[in-house]
């Protein structure tokens, strides 16, 4: 039983650290999500290209708003910040698919 409580305590501590780091990064204060801040490699660019139109438009709106806020040296009101619990990794499934396809092409090229 002691092992489970230690795991639970470390899990809570780790989750608390994740939330702290999420807020410390600052992108949420501009209304951005984690996937909006990814470095745009070729794989990420292809994943963005494959996004459904509504997700792509939402992403562009968040990025444009963040740029505007940054230019004016402002942040959103606290009630409009992206919350850790609400941030979803919307790009991840598309990115995994792109990476899988690229690795498959590389394997075929080796043969």
Swiss-Prot record:
One of its GO terms (biological process) is cellular respiration. Keywords: Acetylation, Electron transport, Membrane, Mitochondrion, Mitochondrion inner membrane, Respiratory chain, Transport. The modification N-acetylalanine is found at residue 2. It is a peripheral membrane protein. GO terms for cellular component: mitochondrial inner membrane; mitochondrion; respiratory chain complex III. Component of the ubiquinol-cytochrome c oxidoreductase, a multisubunit transmembrane complex that is part of the mitochondrial electron transport chain which drives oxidative phosphorylation. Belongs to the UQCRB/QCR7 family. This is Cytochrome b-c1 complex subunit 7. The lineage of its organism: Eukaryota, Metazoa, Chordata, Craniata, Vertebrata.
């Amino acid at each position: 039983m002691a092992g489970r409580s230690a795991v639970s305590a470390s899990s809570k501590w780790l989750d608390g650290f994740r939330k702290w780091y999420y807020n410390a990064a600052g992108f949420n204060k501009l209304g951005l999500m984690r996937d909006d801040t990814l470095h745009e490699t070729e794989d990420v660019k292809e994943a963005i290209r494959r996004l459904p139109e509504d997700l792509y438009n939402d992403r562009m709106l968040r990025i444009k708003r963040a740029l505007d806020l940054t230019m004016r040296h402002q942040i959103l009101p606290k009630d409009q910040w992206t919350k850790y619990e609400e941030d979803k990794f919307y790009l991840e499934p598309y990115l995994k698919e792109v990476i899988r396809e690229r690795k498959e092409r590389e394997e075929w090229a080796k043969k």
